[in-house]
């Protein structure tokens, strides 16, 4: 049996403007009802496969077991600065979602720098030259520590009472944690680390602007994890331990390759 199944009509892989013409299709709840009859032992995940913008425009009347949306930072701005600023939007997105979904549990994913779907055009932009590019099917920073920095910042910003599941990457391909030859990308280690946090207590701890942190309590031991999403070194203080730390930046490629 399937544990969970995400229901999203194919037509809604496209974007529709609030004041524009919408497709003549059954209400989303009709799809959910049918899915629940067929997959009676599975949790039904409502929402969109695309970004939160599309979910906000097409809000289901009922949300069932979970509500889902994906997240990518390169819709409008693919620069390092633009991408590293997107984690700031997550708390506002989740607050809005909580208000109109009656605090339904949340799944966020897929989460990646490169896009999985382009609801605003016929297809994704091919990025064979591996440059910074809006609406691209892949992104060169996925192979760098930059992707680890950004993904961890998204995870930390997403932690709240409603957020229950995250889908970060695939195994192989443009968004994979492994290369074709099975060598490990930086995100492989992040995924393994997050899996290791099962049964731990996690607390958000953001000591200064552009630094996101976690305090982790596991087996009566405390761990601190910080990510610097700025382009400068940052000094932070952990009052509980009475120590200061200097956080360096990721190894993002130079902007000249854009």
Where are these regions (language model features)?
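Conserved small/polar residues in nucleotide/adenosyl-binding loops
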Residues: 248-255
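Carbohydrate-binding surface patches
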Residues: 207-241
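Glycan-recognition and catalytic regions of carbohydrate-active enzymes
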Residues: 160-221
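Aromatic/acidic polysaccharide-binding cleft in carbohydrate-active enzymes
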Residues: 109-187
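Noncatalytic carbohydrate-binding groove/subsite architecture in carbohydrate-active enzymes
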Residues: 18-143
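Non-cysteine beta-strand/loop elements that form the S-adenosyl-L-methionine
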Residues: 5-7, 66-72, 168
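Active-site beta->alpha loop and helix N-cap motifs at the rims of alpha/beta catalytic domains
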Residues: 1-22
């Amino acid at each position: 049996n399937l544990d969970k199944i995400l229901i999203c009509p194919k037509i809604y892989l496209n974007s529709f403007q609030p004041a524009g013409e919408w497709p003549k299709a059954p209400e989303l709840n009709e799809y959910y009802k049918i899915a629940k009859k067929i997959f009676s032992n599975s949790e039904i995940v409502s929402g969109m496969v695309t970004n939160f913008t599309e979910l906000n425009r097409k809000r289901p009347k009922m949300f069932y077991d979970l509500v889902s949306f994906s997240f990518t930072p390169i819709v409008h701005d693919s620069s390092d600065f633009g991408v590293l600023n997107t984690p700031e939007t997550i708390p506002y997105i989740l607050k809005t979602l909580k208000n109109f979904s009656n605090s339904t549990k949340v799944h966020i994913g897929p989460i990646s720098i490169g896009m999985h779907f382009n609801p605003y055009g016929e297809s994704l932009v091919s990025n064979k030259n591996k440059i910074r590019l809006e609406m691209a099917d892949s992104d060169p920073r996925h192979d760098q520590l930059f992707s680890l920095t950004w993904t961890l910042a998204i995870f930390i910003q997403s932690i709240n009472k409603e957020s229950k599941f995250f889908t970060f990457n695939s195994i192989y391909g443009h968004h994979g944690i492994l290369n074709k030859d099975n060598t490990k990308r930086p995100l492989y280690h992040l995924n393994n680390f997050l899996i290791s946090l099962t049964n731990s207590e996690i607390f958000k701890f953001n000591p200064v602007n552009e630094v996101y942190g976690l305090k982790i309590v596991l087996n009566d031991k405390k761990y601190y994890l910080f990510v610097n999403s700025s382009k400068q070194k940052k000094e932070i203080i952990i009052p509980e331990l009475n120590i200061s730390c200097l956080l360096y930046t990721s190894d993002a490629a130079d902007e000249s390759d854009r």
